[in-house]
Amino acid sequence: QKYQGDDELLPFYYYDIYIGDTPIGKISIRIGNNYHSYYNGHIGYEIDKQHRGNNYAYRACKLVLQVAKTHSMCELILTCDESNIASYKTIEKLGAELIEIVKPPKEYFAYREDMEKQRIYKLCLKK
């Protein structure tokens, strides 16, 4: 699926992740940059609980990096909750560098009082 974007959300592509004929998760890649993308990141993924621990998120991320390159993006911001060890290990395996760990400001469109600090990474894309 493709979403055109609005004032808060960047345009994005949304894909189902399959192993054979079995859907095991979802991944999205957001195109461009705005204030919110620093905290929301350019890639979002979710792997069904019974399929976690198999590097499927990593492999799906590697595939959608090609979409970013097609859109002439040179770097991506990748984020996750500070406590999400599996996610930040995936991000680090992709070669992203940690910029900071920070609680998003109240101006962030998805802000909640109880939200965790976010690990914010930068991934430079090779041409």
Where are these regions (language model features)?
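Acyl-donor (CoA/ACP) binding surface of acyl/acetyltransferases
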Residues: 3, 9-127
